Amino acid sequence: MGEHENEGTLILDATCAPQNIRFPTDVSLLNEARLNTEEIIDELHGIGAFGSKKPRTYRQVAKNQYNSFSKSRKKSKKMIRKAMRQQLGYLRRNLKMIHATDKKLREELSAKLQERLSVVEVLYAQQKEMFEKGTHRIDERIVSLSQPWVRPIVRGKQNAPVEFGAKVEMSVVNSYLRIEDLRWDAFSEDTTLQTSVESYRRCFGHYPAHVLADTIFRTRENLRYCKEHDIHISGPRLGKRPADLSVYHEQLREE
Protein backbone atom coordinates (compact mmCIF):
# COMPACT_ATOMS: atom_id res chain seq x y z
CA MET A 1 0.00 0.00 0.00
CA GLY A 2 0.99 3.62 -0.42
CA GLU A 3 1.98 5.94 2.35
CA HIS A 4 -1.54 7.40 2.65
CA GLU A 5 -4.96 5.84 2.93
CA ASN A 6 -6.62 5.11 -0.40
CA GLU A 7 -9.09 7.74 -1.57
CA GLY A 8 -11.19 8.53 -4.61
CA THR A 9 -12.53 6.63 -7.60
CA LEU A 10 -10.73 5.93 -10.85
CA ILE A 11 -12.95 5.17 -13.87
CA LEU A 12 -11.28 3.43 -16.82
CA ASP A 13 -12.58 2.81 -20.32
CA ALA A 14 -11.26 2.40 -23.86
CA THR A 15 -12.60 3.51 -27.21
CA CYS A 16 -11.57 4.13 -30.80
CA ALA A 17 -11.14 7.67 -32.11
CA PRO A 18 -12.36 7.33 -35.72
CA GLN A 19 -9.97 8.74 -38.30
CA ASN A 20 -11.28 10.71 -41.27
CA ILE A 21 -10.60 8.15 -44.01
CA ARG A 22 -12.71 6.64 -46.76
CA PHE A 23 -14.08 3.23 -45.81
CA PRO A 24 -11.38 0.89 -47.15
CA THR A 25 -12.07 -1.95 -49.55
CA ASP A 26 -9.40 -4.09 -51.17
CA VAL A 27 -10.39 -3.11 -54.71
CA SER A 28 -10.59 0.63 -54.02
CA LEU A 29 -7.19 0.59 -52.31
CA LEU A 30 -5.63 -1.26 -55.23
CA ASN A 31 -7.21 1.17 -57.68
CA GLU A 32 -5.85 4.15 -55.76
CA ALA A 33 -2.41 2.52 -55.61
CA ARG A 34 -2.52 1.95 -59.38
CA LEU A 35 -3.36 5.62 -59.95
CA ASN A 36 -0.42 6.58 -57.73
CA THR A 37 1.99 4.42 -59.76
CA GLU A 38 0.68 5.97 -62.99
CA GLU A 39 1.48 9.40 -61.57
CA ILE A 40 4.97 8.19 -60.64
CA ILE A 41 5.51 6.77 -64.14
CA ASP A 42 4.43 10.09 -65.65
CA GLU A 43 6.92 12.00 -63.50
CA LEU A 44 9.72 9.54 -64.27
CA HIS A 45 8.99 9.86 -67.97
CA GLY A 46 9.20 13.63 -67.61
CA ILE A 47 12.82 13.35 -66.40
CA GLY A 48 13.77 10.88 -69.14
CA ALA A 49 13.72 7.66 -67.13
CA PHE A 50 12.15 5.67 -69.99
CA GLY A 51 13.88 7.33 -72.92
CA SER A 52 11.81 9.01 -75.61
CA LYS A 53 8.94 6.50 -75.61
CA LYS A 54 6.51 6.46 -72.71
CA PRO A 55 5.72 2.92 -71.52
CA ARG A 56 2.20 1.53 -71.85
CA THR A 57 0.27 1.28 -68.60
CA TYR A 58 -3.17 0.25 -69.90
CA ARG A 59 -4.57 2.92 -67.63
CA GLN A 60 -7.76 3.46 -69.63
CA VAL A 61 -8.54 -0.27 -69.66
CA ALA A 62 -7.82 -0.48 -65.92
CA LYS A 63 -9.98 2.57 -65.27
CA ASN A 64 -12.90 1.18 -67.28
CA GLN A 65 -12.70 -2.17 -65.49
CA TYR A 66 -12.67 -0.50 -62.08
CA ASN A 67 -15.55 1.83 -62.96
CA SER A 68 -17.61 -1.09 -64.24
CA PHE A 69 -17.00 -2.93 -60.97
CA SER A 70 -17.66 0.06 -58.70
CA LYS A 71 -20.98 0.82 -60.43
CA SER A 72 -22.31 -2.69 -59.78
CA ARG A 73 -24.81 -2.59 -56.93
CA LYS A 74 -24.43 -6.22 -55.93
CA LYS A 75 -20.82 -7.33 -55.85
CA SER A 76 -20.44 -11.10 -55.54
CA LYS A 77 -17.28 -12.70 -54.16
CA LYS A 78 -16.46 -13.83 -57.68
CA MET A 79 -16.72 -10.24 -58.98
CA ILE A 80 -14.55 -8.93 -56.15
CA ARG A 81 -11.89 -11.59 -56.78
CA LYS A 82 -11.88 -10.77 -60.49
CA ALA A 83 -11.55 -7.03 -59.86
CA MET A 84 -8.74 -7.62 -57.38
CA ARG A 85 -6.90 -9.87 -59.82
CA GLN A 86 -7.15 -7.21 -62.51
CA GLN A 87 -5.94 -4.34 -60.33
CA LEU A 88 -3.15 -6.46 -58.82
CA GLY A 89 -1.97 -7.25 -62.34
CA TYR A 90 -1.84 -3.61 -63.44
CA LEU A 91 -0.18 -2.59 -60.19
CA ARG A 92 2.44 -5.34 -60.48
CA ARG A 93 3.21 -4.26 -64.05
CA ASN A 94 3.56 -0.60 -63.06
CA LEU A 95 5.82 -1.36 -60.09
CA LYS A 96 8.02 -3.55 -62.29
CA MET A 97 8.43 -0.68 -64.78
CA ILE A 98 9.22 1.78 -62.00
CA HIS A 99 11.91 -0.45 -60.48
CA ALA A 100 13.45 -1.06 -63.90
CA THR A 101 14.47 2.61 -64.02
CA ASP A 102 17.74 4.02 -62.73
CA LYS A 103 17.69 4.33 -58.93
CA LYS A 104 19.27 7.80 -59.13
CA LEU A 105 16.40 8.97 -61.33
CA ARG A 106 13.84 7.55 -58.88
CA GLU A 107 15.52 9.60 -56.18
CA GLU A 108 14.65 12.71 -58.20
CA LEU A 109 10.96 12.09 -57.61
CA SER A 110 9.25 14.50 -55.24
CA ALA A 111 9.48 13.51 -51.58
CA LYS A 112 5.72 12.98 -51.57
CA LEU A 113 5.85 10.48 -54.44
CA GLN A 114 8.88 8.67 -53.01
CA GLU A 115 7.02 8.21 -49.74
CA ARG A 116 3.85 7.13 -51.53
CA LEU A 117 5.81 4.60 -53.60
CA SER A 118 7.14 2.92 -50.46
CA VAL A 119 3.59 2.71 -49.05
CA VAL A 120 2.21 1.32 -52.33
CA GLU A 121 4.90 -1.39 -52.35
CA VAL A 122 3.85 -2.55 -48.87
CA LEU A 123 0.17 -2.40 -49.81
CA TYR A 124 0.78 -4.46 -52.95
CA ALA A 125 2.67 -7.13 -50.99
CA GLN A 126 -0.11 -7.29 -48.38
CA GLN A 127 -2.94 -7.42 -50.92
CA LYS A 128 -1.16 -10.05 -53.02
CA GLU A 129 -0.63 -12.28 -49.98
CA MET A 130 -4.25 -11.90 -48.82
CA PHE A 131 -5.54 -12.57 -52.34
CA GLU A 132 -3.45 -15.73 -52.70
CA LYS A 133 -4.46 -17.00 -49.25
CA GLY A 134 -8.11 -15.99 -49.64
CA THR A 135 -8.11 -14.01 -46.41
CA HIS A 136 -8.78 -10.44 -45.30
CA ARG A 137 -6.37 -10.39 -42.36
CA ILE A 138 -2.69 -9.54 -42.25
CA ASP A 139 -0.40 -7.91 -39.69
CA GLU A 140 0.03 -4.12 -39.89
CA ARG A 141 -2.61 -3.95 -42.62
CA ILE A 142 -2.70 -0.66 -44.54
CA VAL A 143 -6.23 0.74 -44.87
CA SER A 144 -5.33 4.22 -46.13
CA LEU A 145 -2.54 5.16 -48.54
CA SER A 146 -2.54 8.79 -47.38
CA GLN A 147 -2.55 7.79 -43.69
CA PRO A 148 -0.67 4.45 -43.63
CA TRP A 149 -0.33 4.51 -39.84
CA VAL A 150 -4.08 3.97 -39.36
CA ARG A 151 -5.03 0.41 -38.42
CA PRO A 152 -8.34 -1.44 -38.23
CA ILE A 153 -9.53 -1.78 -34.62
CA VAL A 154 -11.96 -4.61 -33.90
CA ARG A 155 -14.68 -3.25 -31.62
CA GLY A 156 -17.34 -5.95 -31.81
CA LYS A 157 -20.21 -3.46 -31.96
CA GLN A 158 -23.29 -4.49 -33.90
CA ASN A 159 -23.30 -1.40 -36.13
CA ALA A 160 -19.52 -1.02 -36.32
CA PRO A 161 -17.66 -4.30 -35.74
CA VAL A 162 -14.45 -2.67 -37.05
CA GLU A 163 -13.40 0.97 -36.70
CA PHE A 164 -10.43 2.79 -38.17
CA GLY A 165 -8.43 5.11 -35.96
CA ALA A 166 -6.38 5.33 -32.80
CA LYS A 167 -7.32 3.20 -29.81
CA VAL A 168 -7.54 5.34 -26.69
CA GLU A 169 -7.70 4.34 -23.03
CA MET A 170 -9.10 7.09 -20.83
CA SER A 171 -9.59 7.70 -17.14
CA VAL A 172 -12.10 9.88 -15.34
CA VAL A 173 -11.35 11.34 -11.90
CA ASN A 174 -13.58 13.97 -10.31
CA SER A 175 -15.23 14.63 -13.71
CA TYR A 176 -11.85 15.30 -15.35
CA LEU A 177 -10.98 13.18 -18.39
CA ARG A 178 -7.42 12.09 -19.01
CA ILE A 179 -5.86 10.08 -21.85
CA GLU A 180 -3.89 7.22 -20.31
CA ASP A 181 -2.78 5.52 -23.53
CA LEU A 182 -3.14 6.23 -27.25
CA ARG A 183 -1.86 3.89 -29.95
CA TRP A 184 -2.49 3.30 -33.63
CA ASP A 185 -2.25 -0.46 -33.18
CA ALA A 186 -4.81 -2.56 -31.34
CA PHE A 187 -4.02 -3.36 -27.70
CA SER A 188 -5.86 -5.05 -24.88
CA GLU A 189 -7.15 -2.65 -22.24
CA ASP A 190 -6.33 -5.01 -19.38
CA THR A 191 -2.60 -4.36 -19.90
CA THR A 192 -3.03 -0.68 -19.01
CA LEU A 193 -4.86 -0.86 -15.67
CA GLN A 194 -1.81 -1.02 -13.43
CA THR A 195 0.02 1.83 -15.19
CA SER A 196 -3.16 3.95 -14.95
CA VAL A 197 -3.47 3.25 -11.23
CA GLU A 198 0.20 4.08 -10.66
CA SER A 199 -0.30 7.30 -12.62
CA TYR A 200 -3.21 8.14 -10.29
CA ARG A 201 -0.96 7.55 -7.26
CA ARG A 202 1.78 9.83 -8.64
CA CYS A 203 -0.78 12.55 -9.32
CA PHE A 204 -2.70 12.43 -6.02
CA GLY A 205 -0.15 10.93 -3.63
CA HIS A 206 -2.24 7.84 -2.86
CA TYR A 207 -3.97 4.93 -4.56
CA PRO A 208 -7.67 5.13 -5.47
CA ALA A 209 -10.11 3.44 -3.13
CA HIS A 210 -12.19 2.22 -6.08
CA VAL A 211 -11.58 1.35 -9.74
CA LEU A 212 -14.62 1.21 -12.02
CA ALA A 213 -13.90 -0.64 -15.26
CA ASP A 214 -15.33 -3.12 -17.75
CA THR A 215 -15.00 -6.86 -17.25
CA ILE A 216 -12.04 -7.03 -19.64
CA PHE A 217 -9.91 -5.20 -17.03
CA ARG A 218 -10.66 -7.87 -14.40
CA THR A 219 -7.85 -10.30 -15.18
CA ARG A 220 -6.38 -12.44 -12.42
CA GLU A 221 -3.19 -10.37 -12.49
CA ASN A 222 -5.12 -7.10 -12.15
CA LEU A 223 -7.31 -8.51 -9.37
CA ARG A 224 -4.19 -9.64 -7.53
CA TYR A 225 -2.63 -6.20 -7.99
CA CYS A 226 -5.73 -4.39 -6.71
CA LYS A 227 -6.01 -6.70 -3.71
CA GLU A 228 -2.34 -6.14 -2.91
CA HIS A 229 -2.91 -2.36 -2.83
CA ASP A 230 -6.28 -2.56 -1.07
CA ILE A 231 -8.18 -1.23 -4.11
CA HIS A 232 -11.77 -2.28 -4.72
CA ILE A 233 -12.37 -3.05 -8.41
CA SER A 234 -15.91 -3.26 -9.73
CA GLY A 235 -17.48 -6.23 -11.49
CA PRO A 236 -18.56 -9.82 -10.88
CA ARG A 237 -16.14 -12.50 -9.75
CA LEU A 238 -14.11 -14.42 -12.31
CA GLY A 239 -15.21 -17.87 -13.34
CA LYS A 240 -18.53 -19.50 -14.08
CA ARG A 241 -21.71 -17.84 -12.87
CA PRO A 242 -23.28 -19.44 -9.80
CA ALA A 243 -26.05 -21.91 -10.60
CA ASP A 244 -28.26 -19.96 -8.22
CA LEU A 245 -28.91 -16.68 -10.08
CA SER A 246 -29.99 -14.99 -6.86
CA VAL A 247 -26.43 -15.45 -5.58
CA TYR A 248 -25.04 -13.94 -8.79
CA HIS A 249 -27.40 -10.95 -8.61
CA GLU A 250 -26.46 -10.46 -4.97
CA GLN A 251 -22.79 -10.28 -6.03
CA LEU A 252 -23.68 -7.60 -8.59
CA ARG A 253 -25.59 -5.60 -5.98
CA GLU A 254 -22.59 -5.76 -3.67
CA GLU A 255 -20.44 -4.35 -6.46
Predicted regions and their residues:
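Anion-binding and metal-coordination hotspots
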Residues: 1-255
